[in-house]
């Protein structure tokens, strides 16, 4: 068995039968074929920034290390073709330094480009789908590569077809991004609303987003975590009004379909759970949405803590939180919501 601890940001002690870095599509195909012939499960990881290992993984972990960025442009748009192993934050930095704007709100999101479409990553008013042109996918059972446009990706809130139809036996090899040359700042959330849209630069947004994230989110290199552990729940307008009767300052974000998105971190905070600990796992003291590996936590410690948080919030608000983090058992991904229910 090989130690997985350095390859995922929760840094929970767990092992895999084998860990392989794949630097080419041919290597991905070879590892898949070998693993299938030995009847071993395969897990593809980028930087392991959104996974929780519940047990040792009884198979092969393949680290996506497909690298490279190409840039083309026309009169109106910049087009980036980004291979799946590229670090997401470094890509954002690279784009700003090259005068290509539109990714700045997504600064400091951990992980790599190939993982971004799976979760439809988002922050500060921008989601991956807003900048996505296409996603290139390798079907490992046929060795064919195909391209999905944005609509075919079926993006939703922390949701995409890559969690369903294209989950097993597929790997994202590259993403295509389409960024307007006529750049418009997105200043909808947090301290960004205080900026003047007429004078703000993309670099200033980038710096502010980095500052906000660094001030309230723990650095995974120092404190194991997987970022936001829970999704922000979406409730009906009736349910929202009911909660608001008792909590006048409830942060909320009306959605196009009439539903209302609530801030999961605020709900957890109202339950006085910051700092709450089970085993080696704890709710972060600064940002309640983040569960941390405080001291030698096991996967089960985190599961028990997540269950306690979910139950406590449900009892107070009638809202059941869903994990954003993917749970990995000995044989592969499992339903995270079922595990913590």
UniProtKB/Swiss-Prot annotation:
SUPFAM superfamilies: FAD-binding/transporter-associated domain-like, Uridine diphospho-N-Acetylenolpyruvylglucosamine reductase, MurB, C-terminal domain. Its cofactor is FAD. It catalyses: UDP-N-acetyl-alpha-D-muramate + NADP(+) = UDP-N-acetyl-3-O-(1-carboxyvinyl)-alpha-D-glucosamine + NADPH + H(+). It holds the Pfam family MurB_C. One of its GO terms (biological process) is cell wall organization. Residues 12-182 form the FAD-binding PCMH-type domain. Gene3D superfamilies: 3.30.465.10, UDP-N-acetylenolpyruvoylglucosamine reductase, C-terminal domain, Uridine Diphospho-n-acetylenolpyruvylglucosamine Reductase, domain 2. GO terms for molecular function: FAD binding; UDP-N-acetylmuramate dehydrogenase activity. Keywords: Cell cycle, Cell division, Cell shape, Cell wall biogenesis/degradation, Cytoplasm, FAD, Flavoprotein, NADP, Oxidoreductase, Peptidoglycan synthesis. The active site is at residues 158, 228, 324. InterPro entries: FAD-bd_PCMH (IPR016166), FAD-bd_PCMH-like_sf (IPR036318), FAD-bd_PCMH_sub1 (IPR016167), FAD-bd_PCMH_sub2 (IPR016169), MurB (IPR003170), MurB_C (IPR011601), MurB_C_sf (IPR036635), Oxid_FAD_bind_N (IPR006094). GO terms for cellular component: cytosol. It is found in: Cytoplasm. Pathway: Cell wall biogenesis; peptidoglycan biosynthesis. Its main location: cytoplasm. Its EC number is 1.3.1.98. Cell wall formation. Belongs to the MurB family. HAMAP family: MurB. This is UDP-N-acetylenolpyruvoylglucosamine reductase.
């Amino acid at each position: 068995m090989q130690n997985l601890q350095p390859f995922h940001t929760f840094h929970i002690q767990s092992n895999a039968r084998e860990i392989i870095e794949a630097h080419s599509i041919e290597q991905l195909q070879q590892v898949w074929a070998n693993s299938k012939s030995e009847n071993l499960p395969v897990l593809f990881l980028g930087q392991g920034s959104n996974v929780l290992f519940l047990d040792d993984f009884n198979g092969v972990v393949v680290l996506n290390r497909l690298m490279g960025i190409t840039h083309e442009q026309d009169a109106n748009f910049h087009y980036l073709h980004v291979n799946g192993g590229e670090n997401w934050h470094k890509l954002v930095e690279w784009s700003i330094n090259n005068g290509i704007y539109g990714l700045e709100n997504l600064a400091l999101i951990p992980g790599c480009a190939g993982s971004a479409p799976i979760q439809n990553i988002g922050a500060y008013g921008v989601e991956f789908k807003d900048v996505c042109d296409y996603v290139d996918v390798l079907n490992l059972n046929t060795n064919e590569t195909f391209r999905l446009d944005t609509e075919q990706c079926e993006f939703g809130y922390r949701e995409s077809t890559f969690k369903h139809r294209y989950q097993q036996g597929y790997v994202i090899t590259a993403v295509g991004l389409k960024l307007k040359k006529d750049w418009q700042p997105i200043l909808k959330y947090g301290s960004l609303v205080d900026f003047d849209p007429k004078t703000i630069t993309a670099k200033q947004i980038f710096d502010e987003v980095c500052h906000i994230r660094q001030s309230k989110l723990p650095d995974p290199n120092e404190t194991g975590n997987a970022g936001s552990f829970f999704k922000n729940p979406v409730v009906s307008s009736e349910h929202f009004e009911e909660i608001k009767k008792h909590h006048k300052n409830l942060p909320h974000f009306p959605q196009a379909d009439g539903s209302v998105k609530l801030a999961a971190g605020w709900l957890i905070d109202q339950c006085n759970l910051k700092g709450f600990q089970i085993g080696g796992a704890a709710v972060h003291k600064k940002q309640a949405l983040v569960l941390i590996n405080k001291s030698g936590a096991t996967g089960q410690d985190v599961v028990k803590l997540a269950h306690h948080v979910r139950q406590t919030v449900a009892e107070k608000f009638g809202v059941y939180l869903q994990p954003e983090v993917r749970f990995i058992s000995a044989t592969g991904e499992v339903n995270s919501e079922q595990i913590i229910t």
